[in-house]
Swiss-Prot record:
Homodimer. Component of the PET complex, at least composed of EXD1, PIWIL2, TDRD12 and piRNAs. This is piRNA biogenesis protein EXD1. It is found in: Cytoplasm. The keyword RNA-binding applies. Pfam families: DNA_pol_A_exo1. Residues 384-422 are annotated as: Disordered. Belongs to the EXD1 family. It comes from Homo sapiens (Human).
Length: 514
């Protein structure tokens, strides 16, 4: 069907059946929306279908979001599609011509049991907001299904599981050719840490801060969205929709396209490094080497063997900087709420025996994917436990408000009897002279020692012994001690790898510690 015929078909459909579509919009899924319908007045339902097409409103540009400069805004318009007349057909034609687009969705519990209200589709220059609550399944039959199932069009989505389930079971649509930014984040994390996996996935906000380095203040719309949903889970059913909500819908889809590009760049960093080495293999080497090299030699070149060394260095780096939970997954630092970040900004925090300034950076926590990696994790655990057994004074004190869930993600199990004995021994170590730690002292010997303590000179010597043999109670083990002992740094002879030197600047760990 040609473009002109398609537009004429949509226009004819709208003129003939607009009345039935409008009637259906007021009672879409009566069973699912019975609760919100009881709260709304009858006159509110009459404005669900505006008489004139919804106006186009400016949204923040994709390029401007990356510049972080409000004074240099480059506007990209978003268009609300809430009826088939005029704009629906033109929007479908524009989207069909794209190779890559981003898709987001909003509604009440978006899955097979929930209700899809909005479907946001963004291209490089425009954002379309399809009001599925008003348009109904006819919107998919008249173009959207064809786009969502098209294997030639790449759809960028953050966590596609829920939308895929909803489209499949409610509309019979099989979502195809998807680039999921949540999956890509885990894959990039595994590559960056030499094969480890994180203990959790990231939200859209966390992904934007980490990979696009977007300042949290530019992502306030995501916090506002979450707050609105908590206050009123049926906020997406309300008509007419406020401009602030429409902007939130547009920005959700807008950020996904540059996020995909950033993730691709990070995942391709190894390829770029190895190719650069390939380019310089012969042209910067001696000419004598070329005479003895067979062009048909298929052995793995030395330049590509560096990838093995890269992965080894990354595993060692990750083991020094992250904690591992009971499942062998490295604990990822969770982005703190904006309020906590503001309260602690500019202050130095005492973290496990060290003072870190506000510019302190640390990577996230990964986990192994193969059997060899699981063996390395077990080795790390054994070394950590051995260190704790031989050096009880390094055990960090347990905080009173610590939950069992947090403790389950640590190598030191606070519930075990052995650990409790170690903590008791540690406490006594801080409060007791060093010579009192000797085992199997008789009652007579203990009495004699107590009498000796009463002597002023002996008491003075005892205090000196305590100060030299024990650590202060506030001293905590550093993150690197959680894995294995300190080793001398070996200067690598390998060429620099950008992925090895990358440190996430957005993470400020242990913000909740005093």
């Amino acid at each position: 069907m040609e473009d002109s015929e398609f537009l004429a078909y949509v226009e004819l459909l709208d003129e003939v059946e607009q009345g039935s579509v409008r009637a259906k919009a007021s009672s879409v899924s009566l069973h699912a929306e019975r609760t919100w319908m009881e709260k709304m007045k009858v006159e509110d339902l009459n404005v669900c279908e505006p008489a004139s097409p919804a106006p186009e409103a400016p949204a923040t540009s994709l390029l401007n979001d990356l510049k972080y400069s409000p004074s240099e805004e480059e506007e990209v318009t978003y268009t609300v599609i809430n009826q088939f007349q005029q704009k629906f057909g033109a929007a479908i034609l524009h989207i069909k011509k794209q190779n890559v687009l981003s898709v987001a969705a909003e509604g009440a519990n978006v899955c097979r049991h929930g209700k899809l209200c909005w479907l946001q589709v963004a291209t490089n220059c425009r954002v379309y907001l399809f009001d599925i609550f008003l348009l109904g399944s006819r919107a998919f039959h008249n173009g959207l299904q064809m786009i969502l199932e098209d294997k030639r069009i790449l759809k960028v989505i953050h966590d596609c599981r829920w939308l895929s389930d909803c489209l499949s079971h409610q509309y019979g649509i099989l979502l195809n050719n998807v680039f999921d930014t949540q999956v890509a984040d885990v894959l990039q994390f595994s590559m960056e840490t030499g094969g480890y996996l994180p203990n959790c996935i990231t939200t859209l906000q966390e992904s934007l801060i980490k990979h696009l380095q977007v300042a949290p203040k530019y992502l306030s719309f995501l916090e506002k969205r979450q707050k609105l949903i908590q206050e009123n889970p049926e906020v997406w059913f309300i008509r007419p929709v406020s401009p602030s909500l429409l902007k939130i819908l547009a920005l959700e889809a807008t950020y996904l396209l540059p996020l995909r590009l950033a993730l691709l760049d990070e995942m391709m960093s190894d390829l770029t490094t190895l190719v650069d080495g390939y380019l310089n293999t012969y042209r910067e080497g001696s000419a004598d080497r070329l005479g003895g090299t067979e062009p048909t030699c298929m052995e793995l070149p030395e330049e590509l063997l560096q990838l093995k060394d890269f992965q080894k260095q990354r595993r060692e780096k990750a083991a020094r900087e992250y904690r591992v939970n009971a499942q062998g997954l490295l604990i990822r630092t969770v982005l703190q709420p904006k309020k906590l970040v503001t309260e602690t900004a500019g202050k130095e925090e005492k973290v496990k025996g060290f003072l870190f300034g506000k510019n302190f950076r640390i990577d996230k926590a990964p986990s192994f994917t193969s059997q060899d990696f699981h063996g390395d994790v077990n080795l790390l655990k054994e070394e950590s436990l051995n260190k704790q057994a031989t050096n009880p004074q390094h055990l960090p004190p347990t905080e009173e408000g610590e939950t069992s869930e947090d403790s389950s993600n640590k190598l030191i199990c606070t519930k075990s009897k052995g650990s409790e004995d170690q903590r008791i021994t540690q406490k006594e170590h801080f409060m007791t002279p060093k010579h009192e730690f000797q085992a199997s002292l008789s009652l007579k010997e203990e009495t004699e020692q107590l009498l000796m303590v009463e002597n002023k000179e002996d008491l003075k010597c005892t205090k000196q012994a305590v100060s030299m043999s024990s650590f202060p109670q506030e001293t905590r083990v550093s993150p690197s001690d959680t894995f294995y002992p300190i080793r001398k740094t070996v200067v690598s002879t390998l060429p620099p790898c950008p992925a090895l030197e990358k440190i996430d600047s957005w993470i400020s760990p242990f913000l909740n510690l005093p």
